[in-house]
Amino acid sequence: MPDIEIRRAEAGDLNGVAASSAALFAEDGPHDRLRNLQWPSEHGAAWIAGLSEDPDALLLAAVTGNTVVGHLAGSYYPASPMMAGARAELVSMYVVPGLRGKGVGSRLVAEFTAWARERGATRMHVTAYTANEAAVRFYQRRGYAPLWTVLAADL
C-alpha cells in the first residue's frame, strides 16, 4: 500500500477533495432519487472553500504523492439551549475503492474524532443511507449506533 498522509486539506488539495466528493455523490446516487448528482460540479467547490475557511469545520484529505485518495468533512456545534452538549457531525467521507479496507477511512475518522474531542464535543453524528450496508457496518465498528430513524415517503 502506498504511503498515505491524512492532513487538513490544503489549497492544493481542494480540487482533489471536490473530485472525491463527486465520486461519493455518484456512488450514493442510486440510494436517493432526489439526490442532485450535479451538485458537486455546480456547488461543490464553493462548499469546500467555505468549509476550509470555517473555524467550526474540519476538512481532511487523504493524500498519496500529490493525489487526493479520500476526504472527510465534518462540523462542530457547541452546546445550545436545545442541545445540552457539544457535538460534531461527520458530514461527508469517501475513500477510493482500491484503498478501502486498508485503514484509510479509519484514520480519517480517528483524526476527526480527536479534533471533535479537543473542541469539547461529547457526541458525534453521521448519516448513511440504510441501503449502503458497508458504510453502516464501517461506522458501527467504530462505535456509532442508531440514535434516530428517518423515514421517507415518495409523493
State where each predicted segment sits.
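A short helix-loop-beta-strand connector motif used in the catalytic cores of GNAT acetyltransferases and
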Residues: 46-60, 89
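Conserved N-terminal entry element of GNAT/NAT acetyltransferase domains
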Residues: 1-12
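Conserved GNAT acetyl-CoA-binding A-motif
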Residues: 116-127
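Conserved beta-strand in the GNAT
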Residues: 61, 67-76, 89, 94
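Conserved GNAT-fold acetyl-CoA-binding loop/helix
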Residues: 22-47
